[in-house]
Amino acid sequence: MFVYEKKLQYPVKIKNTNPRLASLIISQYGGPDGELGASLRYLSQRYSMPYPELKGLLTDIGTEELGHLEMIGTIVHQLTRNLSEEDIKTGGFDAYFVDHTAGIYPTAASGFPWNAASMAVKGDLIADLTEDLAAEQKARVTYDNILRLSDDPDVNDVIKFLRAREIVHFQRFGEAKRTRWRVTKRAAEQNSRKSSKMVACGCLTLKSMVMGAHPLTAIVFRFPQCGHPSSERSCHSVRQSKGRA
């Protein structure tokens, strides 16, 4: 359950309207690397995370991204309030204005509306954390690009804060990936040593192997007849190949 606190994570107090800048910053509201996608990505990924601390990390960061979404919406609103018709035309805000007036709509700066295809949830610890690391860097680059184009110090102050938080999130995800990789890799290596003895399956002596995509999702494949671990072939296929030899 979420509890809403009626304040922003960082104050947004923009004095001057700037529809051109608003049409760029809206990309971090509903663009491919924006805060809407980030919040949904992390809050969705947490369900399949196998460790409580990772569920908590994704819940915390996903919730913070909702706060960042609110900040971006506030920036765009303050940049576009009380616009005149001339401001809308000369500021390059007319295309957005036709569809949404001055409402806050999740879209990219290019005009494409938000699409769930811009986020990924694989249900695999390494795949999802790697996705999250890349997502934070892409968001950081987008904020860098906004800073290159913005000349409003009030806007830049908030954007710099949001950029800094993306770096912190990147660090937290990196720590989580490294820590869990070391712990689970150690467990997988211990398990592998226990099962590395030469075993006889009745027709051929094989070295048992623990196979998997990576130590965090290690799967032991077993012969259907003798129960010994194998990399890819069944005990029956081994007997057949030996008979042909």
Predicted segments — roles?
Residues 1-224:
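Non-heme di-metal
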Residues 214, 222-245:
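N-terminal low-complexity segments that are often proline-rich with Ser/Thr-Pro
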